[in-house]
Amino acid sequence: INSESVKFLAQNFKKRIVFLSTCSVYGAQDGLLDEKSSINPLSEYASSKVQAEEYLKDSNAIIFRLGTLFGISDAFSRIRLDLVVNILVTKALTEGKLTVFGGEQWRPLLHVNDVANAIMNTLDQNITGVFNLHHKNFKIIDIADAIVKKIPSAKIETTPMKFQDSRNYQVSSEKLFKECGFKAEIDLTTGINEVYDLVANKRIKNVNHKRYSNQNFLEEYGIK
């Protein structure tokens, strides 16, 4: 679906297209990566986004390679608690601990509302191509440290055990700022506070419900 539906769109729709790809296309690489850096997708999801980008390369499309999302969009949408910041805050509150696998992996973080802001900012601009979109690069262990500052009762447990997600990369979003004048502004602390308020105030009855995890939600309906 991620690629073939985009192929149909590119072939049959000639107006403005805004496509949300992912920085996961970079996989695991050293250094600060920009849009000219080589790609190294490590999952079927990332590979499907690479293929979709290829289908759109000659269309009237702006393609955002999104960083790792965090935070809450509004009080009505389905909340995702399977994102690294959101799940660590939730675990800190409900279990009193954060389990960090390794912790030295880098992630380019991006608040979900900055995705909407970027789309609105560029929707009417006659700009096409691929653009990284993130706020700031963080190591996983530094994310955990920031959460413990908010929730001092929580403990960080680190383990050398290899995690199934081997992504590790930092990106630059300078191209987006130079060409479109947009820069993500919502910081990590804001997102931590949002998830903290959501969980601490028990606005979610069961934080372990499958609806709050994309993978679990799809598997419940037989989609893998």
What do these predicted regions represent?
Residues E95-G96, V100-K224:
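C-terminal substrate-binding subdomain of Rossmann-fold SDR/epimerase-dehydratase oxidoreductases
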Residues A28-G31, N40-G67, T90-T94:
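Active-site Tyr-X1-5-Lys
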Residues Q51, Y55, V84, L88, ...:
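Hydrophobic alpha-helix immediately C-terminal to the catalytic Tyr-X-X-X-Lys motif of short-chain
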Residues Y26-G27, S43-E44, R65-L83:
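Flexible, glycine-rich beta-alpha linker
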Residues R16-F19, I62-T68, T99, P108-L109, ...:
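Structural signature of the Rossmann-like NAD(P)-dependent dehydrogenase/reductase core
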Residues K7-E44, I62:
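Conserved Rossmann-fold NAD(P)-dependent oxidoreductase catalytic core, especially the SDR/UDP-sugar
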Residues Q11-I17, K57-A61, D124-T128, K149-S153:
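Short glycine/proline-enriched coil/turn segments at helix->beta-strand junctions
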